[in-house]
Amino acid sequence: MGPGPCRVPRAPGWLLRALALMVAACGRVAFAFNLDTRFLVVKEAVNPGSLFGYSVALHRQTERQQRYLLLAGAPRDLAVGDDYTNRTGAVYLCPLTAHKDDCERMDISEKSDPDHHIIEDMWLGVTVASQGPAGRVLVCAHRYTKVLWSGLEDQRRMVGKCYVRGNDLQLDPGDDWQTYHNEMCNSNTDYLQTGMCQLGTSGGFTQNTVYFGAPGAYNWKGNSYMIQRKDWDLSEYSYRGSEEQGNLYIGYTVQVGNAILHPTDIITVVTGAPRHQHMGAVFLLKQESGGDLQRKQVLKGTQVGAYFGSAIALADLNNDGWQDLLVGAPYYFERKEEVGGAVYVFMNQAGASFPDQPSLLLHGPSRSAFGISIASIGDINQDGFQDIAVGAPFEGLGKVYIYHSSSGGLLRQPQQIIHGEKLGLPGLATFGYSLSGKMDVDENLYPDLLVGSLSDHIVLLRARPVINILHRTLVARPAVLDPALCTATSCVQVELCFAYNQSAGNPNYRRNITLAYTLEADRDRRPPRLRFARSQSSVFHGFFSMPETHCQTLELLLMDNVRDKLRPIVIAMNYSLPLRMPDRLKLGLRSLDAYPVLNQAQAMENHTEVHFQKECGPDNKCDSNLQMRAAFLSEQLQPLSRLQYSRDTKKLFLSINVTNSPSSQRAGEDAHEALLTLEVPSALLLSSVRPSGTCQANNETILCELGNPFKRNQRMELLIAFEVIGVTLHTRDLPVLLQLSTSSHQDNLQPVLLTLQVDYTLQASLSLMNHRLQSFFGGTVMGEAAMKTAEDVGSPLKYEFQVSPVGDGLAALGTLVLGLEWPYEVTNGKWLLYPTEITIHSNGSWPCQPSGNLVNPLNLTLSDPGVTPLSPQRRRRQLDPGGDQSSPPVTLAAAKKAKSETVLTCSNGRARCVWLECPLPDTSNITNVTVKARVWNSTFIEDYKDFDRVRVDGWATLFLRTSIPTINMENKTTWFSVDIDSELVEELPAEIELWLVLVAVGAGLLLLGLIILLLWKCGFFKRARTRALYEAKRQKAEMKSQPSETERLTDDY
């Protein structure tokens, strides 16, 4: 029975967080991977300026003593013990110590002999290679020079030379490998053959083969040489290609290996030619009988001057048993992309060939010389795949990029970048110029990396152990939570367990390791629904010590008022390995077992879920069926297909019906956290919602909570009222985006776009200050040709129209136009009302000139528009000049004669009209339009002298001219009129002659005398007597009554 859960001592949450922060602050958590940059082995040149580190190699010495050595070439180092030579170059062997200056010079017993050879500046150490564990060492000097015919006619041949030394770096005369001359070039030929071959520019070992590159052979076409030993047999091979041109530099770099283009027992030579056709190439050469290397394939570069092929490396990147090829092009560039240097990765096609195009192209930053060095460094993280190092020595102080591989080949992104400037080494520059790996020098089962430079420094980077975390279990109990069963101290219990092993598989690696972990409840939701009992928050920080501790258990509590009970609560865990690393560089070979790193290929997090108990079927999964219908309504709550908008439009309604009913495709179960989201335009402002409190507005977003849950077969109708506040002339429609959402399962909820088309109705008004004017005609007839001024035409008229603004500026969308149906002439073609000028007043004044030259067509001189005074012999026949002008005035002529009047309009056919248009300005102010005209006096005298009054009518219309179909305006029309009266001429009485007066008086007196005489004759002047008067009175007094006519008639019968 296994051990039970182990509980850690309780500690306050703040203390645990403080500890985590303290560990992180005091130590450095490895952000890269497992090449250590704090515990370094650094070696410096004995003689500065010697290019110590130009070439490097890791070597394991097993003869005479057991030790690992760092080999460094210094091709510009000073000569030793030779009076004829200043510089020869050297190779140094450096032990793994904390000292920088304890390297020893390798003994190469080559003495100067100017008559036979020159070793001055021969660049000894340009190439350094180790044969591997218990193997030999190869050292080359590619500028070693042979002297022919010394004296005045001496000739020199820079053929180069390589030296092989034993495992202890000493010369063993009994070893054929070391005593063989290794001079593959014939110094008796000139540069067109092998007289300038520069053997040793590159070279290396296999178990039974030593190989060299000679890029100067054959006029610098170059060549590659290989010496193979099998038992007691020795075979020499060289490439005799058909290339005739020079300057290819074949052999600039060389690698030899098996399982490249042939099975494991056949060798393939891979050699670079960085100047092939100016773009570089890599030759793959097959070993043939007779000592020839036969060309099998050529991989060509893609950019002129990139130096493709100047560095190559072989490694089985995908573990398919075949070696893959990496080729450097350090001077590759892409100006726009800021790229400088490239590495081409060619994946082996199971021994058949390599593809012509790279499977992967890695780039470095501009001017970095990325790819000038490439090395297969072994499996530094022990994940089962080979890793690669690429140098970029001119990026800052130099960088080394570490790439891991997988079953798919090399990974595109580097797993670690070592920065030269961050190593803290004074004087270090061009870090990464040379590389050597594939050897575990501190014997921790992880291969290490030696990095050289041109600044007289070499640096050993050792690999730290990699830890695999096992059994990263995180279990929550119960998995289905019933809130009713929670207590005050526990609701959910979480158990986490860890174990580890070393990636290299060392069973004895049992270091005490403490993981720092973080648990977070409901990480993707705020506010969280669970909290840890110990930290009183949704986050808990803790530590886990291994291998002693196996598991820990933590209690969680449920928050109050949890709404979301549909989605599970995710409890996430992540962990790290905080280590206390030194802040400063520590030199020496200190063990790195105490500083492991976590395997970055593993996920450093885990999670588990806690579900709420729900009534959503046996699978505890709610399958809802929310459906929605929506429509716009008018203010009268009638369906609205288009909005006829005007400034009087205040409200707009949106009706939404939401249902959750079962269907044949969906179960229609409860919809948890059902929500309706509306995205409305800025022209609509939320006013009210029915039912109230359902929706909340946030700028242009409206959120409506439908229910939690919105139950099966539930229906809801929303009536949302908007205030229409921002509709402009540019508004064509009002789009509203409606989106239903729920935390239940429903994958067919798509947004619905509801669009209401808008017709904008402008509101403007047209008014006339005086609809009915009065004027007159009279006088004499004047011909049109005789008229010079407007006063010659007749009496003046003045109409003043007023237009109120439309509110929104029309700008380029349209124009308001005032049109006049103007009574221009009578039916016989004579002038009627002669327009003299039209003026528009709004933020200034300007004339209106309708088309057709209809305003003042005779170009008469205009005068003061005031009323023309009457002549002394004329007066207006108006009885009540202060009376109401809107009713027909009563004139003197009408009072006396009441003669008839006539009406002239275009509608009754008695007048002819023309159409005058005046575009009005786009302004927010009131616009006034003044129309001035003259009554054509001659026409009225000639044709209407028999009428006491003539009335002339016209019409004015305000309308909108636009090409936008959604903008309209109701035409505004008003009438205008003028009453034109004829004038009364009063003639004064003439003087009468005196004699006529006297005759008339005399005749009157004679007539009066005759009348008096006649009356006298008739007794008119006689007086009655007194008695007769009295009798008459008495008789009259006695009379009672006179009989009627009827009585008289009856009395006669």
From Swiss-Prot:
Tissue: Isoform 1 and isoform 2 are expressed in heart and brain. Only isoform 1 is detected in lung.
Disulfide bonds: 94-103, 140-162, 185-197, 486-491, 497-551, 616-622, 695-704, 848-906, 913-918
Glycosylation sites: 86, 501, 512, 574, 606, 657, 699, 843, 859, 925, 928, 937, 971
Keywords: Cell adhesion, Cell junction, Cell membrane, Cell projection, Cleavage on pair of basic residues, Disulfide bond, Glycoprotein, Integrin, Lipoprotein, Membrane, Palmitate, Receptor, Repeat, Signal, Transmembrane, Transmembrane helix
Location in or out of the cell: Cell membrane; Cell projection, Invadopodium membrane; Cell projection, Filopodium membrane
The keyword Transmembrane appears for this protein: yes
Segments on the Cytoplasmic side according to the record's topology features: 1022-1053
Range of residues in the leader sequence: 1-32
GO molecular function: collagen binding; fibronectin binding; integrin binding; laminin binding; protease binding; protein domain specific binding; protein heterodimerization activity
Location of the region described as Disordered in the Swiss-Prot/TrEMBL record: 865-890
Record topological domains on the Extracellular side: 33-993
FG-GAP-type repeats, residues: 38-103, 110-171, 185-235, 236-293, 294-355, 357-412, 416-478
Main location: membrane
InterPro entries with a match to the protein in the record: FG-GAP (IPR013517), Int_alpha_beta-p (IPR013519), Integrin_alpha (IPR000413), Integrin_alpha_C_CS (IPR018184), Integrin_alpha_Ig-like_1 (IPR013649), Integrin_alpha_Ig-like_2 (IPR048285), Integrin_alpha_Ig-like_3 (IPR048286), Integrin_alpha_N (IPR028994)
Transmembrane segments: 994-1021
Positions where lipid (S-palmitoyl cysteine) attaches: 1018
Family in the record: Belongs to the integrin alpha chain family.
Protein name, per record: Integrin alpha-3
